[in-house]
Amino acid sequence: MTHDTPIYVVAGALVDGRGRVLIAQRPEGKALAGRWEFPGGKKLAHETPRDALNRELLEEIGIQVARARPLIEVRHRYSPDAPPVLIDCWLVEQWRGEIASLDGQALRWCEREALPDADILEADRAIVTALRLPPTFVRVDDPDSLEQRIPTARGRERAAWIVPAMPRDPSITRRLRDHGDHVYVLDPQALPEGASGRIHSGRHLEWRVAGSRELAGQVVHSGAQAHAAVADGVDFLLVPDRALPDEEMAVIAGCGLPYYVNVAAPAGPEALPATGKLWWKGAPQGPVVA
């Protein structure tokens, strides 16, 4: 293994029926003891990622994975002299057996929105963001039509809605957010009183009420724009051009942020279609739809 060859690690983000996520505290005697992380460990050379996930979770917390899907891949280097680590995190939605601490670690269930307050390892911070983000983004031209989404909110997965302005009835946004949905506006001038929006290079999607933790995203068309977005402090990326060269997508994937790719609009350099819905589906290194 060379100095630049990453150490391949698998991790499992277990989500219970209430939407809480299981985290584990590193025990005394291990590096970074006391910090919290997602259960998992190193993949063996002969294993597939899923096989490694099954083995690690059985060894660490005594469960058998019944249903899981890729959530995000994160590259991290703990120090300039340390080899990089590739964390392949899976969303574990069903399992068999009772969860137990088999490695001397403390375990606890944590609400998704409380994860930023947990003393999570720096390497796992992008996983926290991916867990807070919904699997799908949808472009809606009529903000008031979001009210039609409320009656079915309990029967579908969380989603994020991209609108040109906030709905006139503020209760629409509130009820969607109570379900776990996110609402983003394209025009910062259309934000409600008490909210703040910002535009960096490219189009920036944000609705951040004072004191809230709404995640901010940015539309990017190249690897260079993705790096600039990371420097601007965004939380996720939207990639509208599905015809980007593989090398550009590789740069975007390597930025360490969750990202979404356009699977509905025609290929091309346009930022966002002027009308109609736009669906975003996570790439293998980002949030994915089951």
List each model region and its residues:
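N-terminal active-site wall of soluble small-molecule enzyme domains
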Residues: 145-217, 223-225
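Active-site-adjacent beta-strand/loop module that shapes the phosphate/pyrophosphate-binding cleft
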Residues: 74-99
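Conserved Nudix-box catalytic region and its N-terminal flanking loop in Nudix hydrolases
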Residues: 20-60
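Nudix hydrolase/Nudix homology domain
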Residues: 35, 99-159, 289-290
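Conserved N-terminal beta-strand and adjoining loop/helix that marks the start
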Residues: 1-21
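A short coil-to-beta-strand element that immediately follows conserved catalytic motifs
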Residues: 63-73, 90
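Catalytic cores of alpha/beta
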Residues: 184, 190-196, 205, 216, ...
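Glycine-rich phosphate-binding active-site loops on the catalytic face of alpha/beta enzymes
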Residues: 235-244, 264-290
